[in-house]
Amino acid sequence: MDDLVREELPNGTRRLFARDAQGGEAGFAVIEPGRPGQPAMVEVQVRPEHRSCGLGGRLVRAALDEAGPGAYLWDHENSPASQAIVRRNGLVPVRTLCQMRRWLAYPPLPEPVFPDGVSVRQYQGPQDDEELLRVNNAAFDWHPEQGGWSIEKLRERLAQPWVDPAGIFLARDEQDRLIGFHWTRTHPQTQTEHKLGEVYVLGVDPACHCKGLGKALTLVGLRHLRDQGLAQAKLYVEQTNAPALATYRGLGFTVHAQDVAYVRG
């Protein structure tokens, strides 16, 4: 196996990859820089035919060295091979994301009930961006990936080809001030998954004390996904976020899988 090759990608992202004897890509690691005060994120993939030869561990060590102190290594598989790499490299878990899923036809989705004075409409374009950014950053000021966005990052995300403005729902108070939003997403069918909806981002302004707003916004988005003909929806939630877990369980979601972030001990 040749030495690892380094590649600089946009926005400070770096990529390390290894080639096999025929020059094909055997595996790679992606290093995404964290925002100020937050750790870098590392993900590693090795092609099945090149596993069990030490390449995964080599990529993990090289990527963590390059990413710097405190970098997170994400494990999306929790397989025996990935757990062996974790043990051999003295990595310890620091964060767990629960992927939860729900069938959209049953149990039936109830009608959303919004607090008095709250109205909901769909995203209408750039005129909504500043308010959307304000609520996002207030709701996720603690979050390594979702918080601390700039207007440029928000608009870059909104410009992605998968974004459907009709699937972004904005909740406003009696003063027409944005107090919460639900951004949904649809994932196309793959070889291993059917077409799938997602509660992509759900944010409520922490200054808003409207009880039940998050639940109502969730239901609006889920009913939209159902009406698009989707059979199932997923979401991701921090394992430590007990109130959110309770809300989603109350709406019929169950844990489908877990993604775990590790750091060097």
Swiss-Prot record:
Pfam families given in the database record: Acetyltransf_1 (PF00583)
Origin superkingdom: Bacteria
InterPro entries in alphabetical order: Acyl_CoA_acyltransferase, GNAT_dom, Mycothiol_AcTrfase
GO MF term (any one): mycothiol synthase activity
Annotated binding of acetyl-CoA 2, by residue: L202, G203, V204, H209, C210, K211, G212, L213, G214, K215
Gene3D superfamilies the UniProt entry points to: 3.40.630.30
Transferase among keywords: yes
Group of enzyme by EC: transferase
EC number, UniProt record: 2.3.1.189
Domain named N-acetyltransferase: residues: 1-110, 118-265
UniProt keyword list: Acyltransferase, Repeat, Transferase
GO BP annotation list: mycothiol biosynthetic process
Protein residues bound to 1D-myo-inositol 2-(L-cysteinylamino)-2-deoxy-alpha-D-glucopyranoside: D3, E145, R185, E198, Y236
Binding positions (acetyl-CoA 1): V44, Q45, V46
Catalytically driven reaction(s): 1D-myo-inositol 2-(L-cysteinylamino)-2-deoxy-alpha-D-glucopyranoside + acetyl-CoA = mycothiol + CoA + H(+)
Functional summary from the UniProt entry: Catalyzes the transfer of acetyl from acetyl-CoA to desacetylmycothiol (Cys-GlcN-Ins) to form mycothiol.
Family to which the UniProt record says this protein belongs: Belongs to the acetyltransferase family. MshD subfamily.
Record text on subunit structure and interactions: Monomer.
Full protein name: Mycothiol acetyltransferase
Organism: Segniliparus rotundus (strain ATCC BAA-972 / CDC 1076 / CIP 108378 / DSM 44985 / JCM 13578)
